[in-house]
Amino acid sequence: MLFLANPMSKDDIRSLPGVGPKTAEKLISAGYDSLIKIASASVEELMEAADIGEATARKIIEAAMERLGLLEFKTAEEVLEERQKTARITTMSKNLDSLLGGGIETAALTEFYGEYGSGKTQVGHQLAVDVQLPPEQGGLEGKAVYIDTEGTFRPERIKQMAEALDLDPKKALKNVYHMKVFNTDHQMLAARKAEELIRKGEPIKLIVVDSLTALFRAEYTGRGQLAERQHKLGRHVHDLLRIAELYNVAIYVTNQVMAKPDSFIPGLDSVQAVGGHVLAHASTYRVFLRKGKKGIRIARLVDSPHLPERETTFVITEEGIRDPE
């Protein structure tokens, strides 16, 4: 975990061994304009971006890592100290916050998956409002980026939720940056644009991607394209995780489900999240949502680095996400 306070200058790149003026120009134009971006790139990505050989790409990446101290081991005590810099954003449901260990964690990727109407998008809207609250109310006094792949973002809902929390609705709307994306390349570019906002000094503390996998499913339909789809999805998730860890930002993504073959039991055992192992291994927290009776939503924590698998309930009201009465 490495939180950056300030953006790296482009001059840092030019001082790396193996990076001449032409290579630097190619790297910068391809988006590799800082040491950390180069350090977190794969050898193949750098080879393609700068049109250089494998040995040169590896040398440049290792030099960037060395400059940033990424090749040094840390004690568990030091890691614990770094983790204490992370924060959490309330969902406005004490039940849901408790399930997640206090809310949506920064420097992590939280995935909510479930069928249509289970509440995934509503949670995303709620978080985009809640992140603006002061820390004593469960927020981070920050702004949100909302990457919308299915056209489900509604500013009217942001306004409604903000008013319920006594926030200035006009200010709340200005604190949410929305981008409607139309294909997977556009989606991946949106994540990089979000990083640019952060590097320019915007206090972005939350990035919502709703939905993470919809466009990938739409573009890569056949079995023959599955490997390509998973590779590209993996790169996108890697970008999101890098942003989360570098800038101490919370990433909230929604995901679709598909029926499990040979399953006849309704609920968790009858569906599985889209994205396969790529997403399963990348998500820090994974929550399955389903509808219960009388408007109740059931949330099950399926995966977490340190929390037990368990269930809780919440409701979606006019005011937003709340606990059942």
From Swiss-Prot:
GO terms for biological process: DNA recombination; DNA repair. It comes from Nanoarchaeum equitans (strain Kin4-M). Signal peptide: none annotated. Gene3D superfamilies: 5' to 3' exonuclease, C-terminal subdomain (1.10.150.20), P-loop containing nucleotide triphosphate hydrolases (3.40.50.300). This is DNA repair and recombination protein RadA. Keywords: ATP-binding, DNA damage, DNA recombination, DNA-binding, Nucleotide-binding. It comes from the Archaea. The lineage of its organism: Archaea, Nanobdellota, Candidatus Nanoarchaeia, Nanoarchaeales, Nanoarchaeaceae. Belongs to the eukaryotic RecA-like protein family. Pfam families: HHH_5, Rad51. InterPro entries: AAA+_ATPase (IPR003593), DNA_recomb/repair_Rad51_C (IPR013632), DNA_recomb/repair_RadA (IPR011938), DNA_recomb/repair_RecA-like (IPR016467), DNA_repair_Rad51/TF_NusA_a-hlx (IPR010995), Hlx-hairpin-Hlx_DNA-bd_motif (IPR003583), P-loop_NTPase (IPR027417), RecA_ATP-bd (IPR020588). GO terms for molecular function: ATP binding; ATP hydrolysis activity; ATP-dependent DNA damage sensor activity; damaged DNA binding. Involved in DNA repair and in homologous recombination. Binds and assemble on single-stranded DNA to form a nucleoprotein filament. Hydrolyzes ATP in a ssDNA-dependent manner and promotes DNA strand exchange between homologous DNA molecules. ATP binds at residues 114-121.
